[in-house]
């Protein structure tokens, strides 16, 4: 009898359920179960961030990056969730970090020497496993990096001072080419042409059409920025990316014509040692079978676009800051007079220009251009107590870190922020470690040579009190002015060398 009562078959289960649980309760239990499932998933990560929410969270976070731009989205998420947080890009877990201790750990270790980005996007712009900037294959990247390091140091760095200064002088003598009818100077175009001319003189040495290639470089950069984290489905709809594909092709075709001429000259050169430069070294490596032709072409392209792409914008922001801060301009001019006088700048002067160096550092801290770094974890790790799995994407929000830690007046532009030595873990405009910027030393040389040459000849002024704070900017892969807006030009007033401190 007892066994019969315990036997579930003895009962009609369908008649029992309605008595024990009303039909309306079933949806509630299902929703509760789903909630517990989601809660259990989210509980597997101790890192702050938005909820997974049945896959909706990753879609929203990736969508925010596409809508706001990478830089703006990073700042948003760090403000909301803290300085070490987690989102998703293309369904992959991605950390956004603005803590100096975490950045220091990541930059110094080899297992963070890879970047991340859409494979299809990088293939479209020619950077997938080629070149150096976004080459995500560590072994291939290690093959190309030494060519860049050699070209950007030693004799090349020494020559850069004279080459850069002479190029700017030549372009200033033709200032009317970038001056409109009102007498306003298109500073960005001027600086981009100087940067391209300087890079070509040192690394390729083939005559080129500066104005045409500068325009093509901007088109290439727009494509790079637009395609870097696009979802794969974007590339299945040809009309969506067709214009970017064309922009990339326009620049690559132009550069390949120059490289073809370089190859021809190398083949007819009797004394090869007299034509050795960055491009020649790469072409000879190709002949030895060390590099593919496609990789050689991409390396040369990246060397030519690097300075016009970022350094020109950095110098543009610096000139706007000088225009707003006459006391800083006066201090820089005094130092130029003391260290250099009326002669041309030389390599020995570079280290002596301390006021200018602090100005450059403070400009890059206060108004950065490249303010984030994208990396990928190549093995499991623990960072500041948080577990990081192999394959995790990481974005280092350097620009935000520069306004959060160490500096006495982080939200002001003032040289007081560099009055004392700043430990390098708190200031990383170029990064450091295995994947630090290969051109960080030559970049400082170029910026000092440009500023000395320009400021000793002209006093600069913005239009209608325009300043870096009021310029409308696009904050995506980098932070740069929105060039569709007006009043980005400047007024250049010739400076009387005998009265250069009157302004």
Swiss-Prot record:
Disulfide bonds: none
GO molecular function, one term: estrogen 2-hydroxylase activity
GO biological process annotation, one example: syncytium formation
Keyword Membrane: yes
Gene3D superfamilies: Cytochrome P450
Tissue-by-tissue expression: Widely expressed, including in adult and fetal brain, placenta, skin fibroblasts, adipose tissue and gonads.
Cofactors (names): heme
Binding-site residues for substrate, renumbered to this chain: 309, 374
Subcellular compartments: Endoplasmic reticulum membrane; Microsome membrane
Membrane topology: Multi-pass membrane protein
Recorded family membership: Belongs to the cytochrome P450 family.
Protein name as it appears in the record: Aromatase
